[in-house]
């Protein structure tokens, strides 16, 4: 099984468990917090992904840490399952896939907007308005900065890429010029 399918399977299983109790958002918040704690602590991360540390030791340490928290039982069991199956290294990917499932369940499309510099709030609102009007669907926009696009924006959602950047335009012009023959 490839890594993407594995990640998706874990995310779907977690989402379906949360759906049974109608606590999808709570579970998302808790696994996001848990992931942030693991990612921010080099020692915890290394401990959890280390093949040298016995799984039983990992489970005992996590159980003692979890005992003092108010994490949902679903999240506790999920983390223990990841440890048991040596999958803690894909937790951040699972959180991302779970987030997508959460948006999809609310009929919200995730859209990534890349610009060469930070966009002003009014620009972000205008872009969101235009995209929602075109897609006829609510969107959740995530803005990233990539100064290599020189100017303009690049919009990504599903398998669609809309390149309105200067870099993209220059590449299209260069491609066309390669096909031009000078007599």
From Swiss-Prot:
GO cellular component term of the entry, any: plasma membrane
Compartment(s) of residence: Cell inner membrane
Membrane topology: Peripheral membrane protein
Major localisation: membrane
Coiled-coil annotated residue ranges, if any: none
GO MF: proton-transporting ATP synthase activity, rotational mechanism
SUPFAM superfamilies from the UniProt entry: N-terminal domain of the delta subunit of the F1F0-ATP synthase
Classification via Pfam families: OSCP
InterPro entries the UniProt entry points to: ATP_synth_OSCP/delta_N_sf, ATPase_OSCP/dsu
Keywords for this protein: ATP synthesis, Cell inner membrane, Cell membrane, CF(1), Hydrogen ion transport, Ion transport, Membrane, Transport
Entry similarity comment: Belongs to the ATPase delta chain family.
Assembly with partners or alone: F-type ATPases have 2 components, F(1) - the catalytic core - and F(0) - the membrane proton channel. F(1) has five subunits: alpha(3), beta(3), gamma(1), delta(1), epsilon(1). F(0) has three main subunits: a(1), b(2) and c(10-14). The alpha and beta chains form an alternating ring which encloses part of the gamma chain. F(1) is attached to F(0) by a central stalk formed by the gamma and epsilon chains, while a peripheral stalk is formed by the delta and b chains.
Classification via NCBIfam families: ATP_synt_delta (TIGR01145)
Role, per record: F(1)F(0) ATP synthase produces ATP from ADP in the presence of a proton or sodium gradient. F-type ATPases consist of two structural domains, F(1) containing the extramembraneous catalytic core and F(0) containing the membrane proton channel, linked together by a central stalk and a peripheral stalk. During catalysis, ATP synthesis in the catalytic domain of F(1) is coupled via a rotary mechanism of the central stalk subunits to proton translocation.
Name the UniProt record assigns to this protein: ATP synthase subunit delta
The organism's taxonomic lineage, starting at the top: Bacteria, Pseudomonadati, Pseudomonadota, Alphaproteobacteria, Rickettsiales
């Amino acid at each position: 099984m490839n890594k993407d399918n594995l990640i998706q399977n874990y995310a779907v299983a977690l989402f379906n468990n949360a759906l049974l109790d109608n606590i999808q958002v709570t579970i998302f918040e808790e696994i996001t917090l848990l992931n942030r704690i693991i990612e921010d602590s080099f020692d915890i991360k290394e401990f959890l992904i280390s093949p040298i540390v016995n799984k039983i030791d990992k489970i005992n340490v996590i159980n003692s840490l979890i005992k003092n928290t108010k994490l949902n039982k679903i999240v506790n069991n999920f983390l223990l399952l990841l440890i048991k199956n040596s999958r803690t290294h894909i937790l951040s990917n699972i959180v991302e896939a779970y987030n997508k499932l959460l948006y999809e369940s609310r009929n919200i499309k995730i859209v990534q907007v890349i610009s060469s510099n930070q966009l002003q709030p009014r620009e972000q609102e205008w872009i969101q308005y235009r995209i929602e009007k075109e897609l006829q669907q609510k969107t959740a926009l995530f803005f990233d900065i990539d100064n290599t696009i020189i100017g303009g924006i690049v919009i990504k959602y599903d398998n669609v890429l809309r390149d309105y950047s200067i870099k993209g335009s220059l590449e299209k012009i260069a491609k066309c010029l390669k096909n031009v023959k000078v007599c």
